[in-house]
A protein has these predicted regions:
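Binding-site signature for planar aromatic cofactors or substrates
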Residues: 24-254
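Short helix-onset patch at the extreme N-terminus, typifying the N->h transition
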Residues: 7-8, 37
Length: 254
């Protein structure tokens, strides 16, 4: 299937202002003063495009084989930036659902691995509920893969091994950021980075922070979606009841 070229849209950075305490940031895009810049309801409703006819008659019996194939094709597509980017959704306190984009860093031991701060908002949500979902939205290929499953921490050894492969600046950033905690100013963050940089200069071994490491999602469902003409999309879903049972592949109505 020929890739679909999406125009690059440049966005001006909205002006920022701080209150006297320097803690609260407010943004004003000017929409309220210039309502013509905003999209009308009719304009939003009119946003649609026709999908192609690159359908999928079947998939391999093993979902990981299928995923590796699709990920490889996405990575080779010049119009997809970071094919390993996935939307992670978690359920936290008061059943609050939150989503954010993280990067897939490994597919092994029957699961999908990502790394983060263990004191972050997502980590606290995972502590409360180990059911999560992942979404790989490969728009340029009219494809997506959605995954739901059980998440748990990987071993410290695995986290150490991956952390050692990260660029020095990313390693220092893991020490500098108290992820998801209130921040008085950008300068405070930069100061923490400078302090960590002085402690571990570039070229030295930076130890992994105890509060940083990996999680692995063991899937219960993996749905492969391919856009088709007339909204007659293809949906093939692998499902199992337990993380150690066999997958069953079923086609669903779009």
């Amino acid at each position: 299937m020929a890739p679909i070229l999406h125009p690059k849209v440049g966005c001006a950075r909205p002006p920022e202002s701080q209150d006297d305490a320097g803690a609260k940031v407010t943004l004003d895009t000017g929409m309220s003063q210039n309502p013509d810049q905003s999209l009308t309801r009719d304009a939003i409703r009119a946003m649609r495009r026709s999908y192609g006819d690159a359908g999928m008659e079947s998939l391999p019996a093993d979902p990981f084989t299928a995923f590796h194939q699709w990920l490889g094709e996405a990575a080779a597509n010049e119009y997809i930036v970071e094919a390993n980017a996935m939307v992670l959704s978690t359920i936290g306190g008061n059943d609050e659902i939150t989503s954010r984009t993280v990067l897939l860093k490994d597919i092994s031991e029957g699961g999908f691995t990502f790394f983060t701060n263990y004191q972050s908002r997502k980590a606290h949500a995972i502590d409360l509920n180990d059911r999560v979902s992942l979404l790989f939205p490969w728009f340029a290929m009219e494809r997506q893969v959605s995954i739901s499953g059980i998440v748990s921490k990987i071993s410290e050894k695995e986290s150490d091994e991956y952390f050692a492969t990260r660029p020095w600046s990313s390693q220092i950033g893991a020490w500098a950021s108290a992820q998801s905690q209130p921040l008085e100013s950008r300068e405070e963050l930069e100061s923490r980075f400078t302090g960590a940089s002085a402690k571990w200069p570039e070229g030295t071994v930076v130890p992994r922070p105890a509060h940083w490491g990996g999680y692995r999602v063991l899937p219960l469902t993996l749905e492969f979606w391919q856009g088709r003409y007339s909204r007659l999309h293809d949906r093939l879903r692998y499902e199992r009841e337990q993380t150690d049972s066999e997958f069953v592949l079923t086609r669903y109505y779009p």
